Amino acid sequence: MALCVGLTVAGTAIAEVGYPEKEDLKFGFIKLTDMAPLAIAYEKGFFEDEGLYVTLEAQANWKVLLDRVIDGELDGAHMLAGQPLGATIGFGTQSHIITAFSMDLNGNGITVSNAIWDKMKKYVPRKDGKPVHPIKADYLKPVVAEYKKKGKPFKMGMVFPVSTHNYELRYWLAAGGINPGYYAPHKGDITGQIKADALLSVTPPPQMPATMEAGTIFGYCVGEPWNQQAVFKGIGVPVITDYEIWKDNPEKVFGVSKKWADKYPNTHIHVIKALIRAAKWLDENNNKNRPEAVKILSKSQYVGADYEVIANSMTGTFEYEKGDKREVPDFNVFFRYFATYPYYSDAIWYLTQMRRWGQIADQKPDSWYMDIAKKVYRPDIYAIAAKELIAEGKMKAEDFPDFDKEDGFRAPQKHFIDNVVYDGTKPNAYLKKFKIGLKGDDKI
């Protein structure tokens, strides 16, 4: 169902940046809890405050969503962080897509079927009768080997070739010594299954639990509420969250075409302002607004899952095995830790994973990674929106990075499951640290 919003023009905001060149907007999203900033900006009137009439429309899958942004049927959308990058470099449909807003950190999990968990759990260390976390793919490796010995493919699902989920699942598997396979676009092979120990394929998020229940896949990596849904249905066990694979990893972004952004620069800034306010609302006062957010998201026009299923992760907990509910306060982060700022280093990490698994077929110099990051990630636009909000008294300067000093690179990040340190200024050196994966001039 589409949602339409009216407006009351907020004079000061529009006077500062300039009126929106386009007021009637249609944004796309996938039914996942991390579309929340769009829903909250709509429901709380933040779009209205910026002089915008907005329609929010659920899309069938990530490909349809991206194609509709490229074709101009959508003004912008909730996107996988890898989508603007993949489109811009031409992996899949080529189109220059940009982002000036990161929608969230974390928010995904990896779930396996009950049958796989039964085989896997005997290898998992236990304390006080419960599995010790994080659960590494090392404990899945003997199960995959058993399938291989019997000549059976070990199949898992992820949501899109350039999704965080694909790269997180691959990262987790490879850290446990399981090769998730390679892409070879230069040879016309975009299955991602060359030399694979585990075969990964695309399944739209809402279909993950049913696809696993049918036995088509044995596990998957997806966002919420589709891991918790497996627990509620009693068909699977989430074994790890992406927070445990890479602490505070960037997840979704708000993407628009470069052509659209150039044509409607003021509109774009007003949209980013509304989304920043929505993200702040979602995290403020130690997540006190989350129960209300869950109620909104459970509506059929948004995520449309049961309140309890969405609340399981959105309110700071996460259930692994049935009854094994643990505190994960940062499972969903929308504003803390400068979550909304589009860091170049985040973009470069995604590009390194595209290279690692062959989506980028040839070696590229470090300068290439930086150039693409700057083409796609636009902290300059974000800074204009943030400064407007500060000037209007809606936000404080400390809510944001110091724009005079910020260079777009996070400090080297150490919190990965394999303890490999990531420094976004040295992408090729980073790739050389991995035992499994392409590096240097490697080519499939």
Describe the residue ranges of each PLM region.
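Short glycine- and hydrophobic/aromatic-rich loop-to-beta-strand nucleating segment
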Residues: 110-111, 253-256, 260-261
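Secondary-structure end/capping motifs
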Residues: 263-379
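Short, glycine-/small- and polar/acidic-enriched structural segments
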Residues: 16-195, 199-203, 211-248, 418
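N-terminal signal peptide c-region/cleavage motif recognized by signal peptidases
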Residues: 10-12
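Conserved C-terminal helix/tail region of periplasmic/extracytoplasmic solute-binding proteins
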Residues: 348-444
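Short, well-ordered alpha-helical packing segments
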Residues: 170, 227, 231, 255, ...
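Soluble non-cytosolic domains of exported or imported proteins
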Residues: 32, 59-63, 78, 159-163, ...
